Amino acid sequence: WSAGKQFTQRIAYSTDGGETLHKIDKSVLPTVCKENRDPKVFWHEKSGAYIMTLWLEENDFGIFRSTDLLKWEQTDRLTFKEAWECPDLVCLKDEKGNETWMFWSADGFYFWGEFDGYQFQTDGVRHAAYINKIAYAAQTYSNTGNRVISVPWLRFPNRGRNYTGAM
């Protein structure tokens, strides 16, 4: 269904608490790379902007920012060896309110660093959250206070069923 088509990033919004969604008919972000996909958008209070992480190609990811969700500017391009797809950028706070940021990729690799609303600075040391390849493409919820809630897709065959894996 997507063969030969460019990947685009689009927006749907709700004015009634999510009961109905209204789609914006055009792409809000020009195609950066042929198959760029898997956007994750969150509000970054300190810089007063929405932030989007996006898989670009191979081991490359982009960070974009917008104040209105319609016009986006790329502010960073990151390359992490052996990491790909489904990026997430998460702020973790300790008991004293000190922040550290974690950049996450689909395969459970993550990188510690600092984020200023424009760029993610890291030492590049890759950490692995999983000991096997069952969990994949975890994403976190926004607006959960100081809690970080992450839900992965658990990839395993369900023979005789019309689905694969579980969330």
Regions flagged by a language model, labelled:
Residues 1-167:
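Carbohydrate-active catalytic/glycan-binding domains of CAZyme proteins
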